[in-house]
Amino acid sequence: MKIILCSACDVPKLSEMNKYLIEDEKSHNHMHLVELEHRMSEFLDREYNAYLFIEEEKVVGYALVKYLPDGYYLRQFFIDRDFRRRHLGTAAFNELLKELNAESIIIDCLPWNEAGLSFWKSLGFKEAAITMKLKKS
């Protein structure tokens, strides 16, 4: 597994994978690809770094990470559907840890995303908070 720091030229590929991530986690985000590209560009222009995960010369996923004073915030982590169930998510995450030299990482996982919750717990993550939302009609 190789990990590559992304640049602006990677925004289309990152945004495409972000669209799949949104679908897979059944997020309430209804942004179109053009909107996701704009948002990804803003993330990279500001305080986030994105990394591509490469296995056998193929892009298999990505991560979007922000540095915090006490560690890192992993905003997005995605492994392509065609490459799942092969331990590539674990390998990619371990490469990311090495790349960042991270002691602490914070993630968010939607409560109905059972596959995501199971994956993160398998890596040793524990619940640290519960975020709640009120949406008035």
Model-derived regions: residue spans:
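A conserved beta-turn-beta hairpin within the catalytic core of GNAT-like acetyltransferases
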Residues: 67-75, 84, 127-128
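A short helix-loop-beta-strand connector motif used in the catalytic cores of GNAT acetyltransferases and
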Residues: 41-52
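Conserved GNAT-fold acetyl-CoA-binding loop/helix
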Residues: 18-40
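Conserved acetyl-CoA-binding loop of GNAT-fold acetyltransferases
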Residues: 121-130
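A short beta-loop-alpha structural element at the N-terminal edge
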Residues: 1-16
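Conserved acetyl-CoA pyrophosphate-binding loop and the N-cap/start of the following alpha-helix
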Residues: 83, 87-95
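Conserved beta-strand-loop-alpha-helix junction that forms the acyl-donor binding cleft
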Residues: 106-117, 133-137
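Conserved beta-strand in the GNAT
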Residues: 52, 58-66, 73, 78
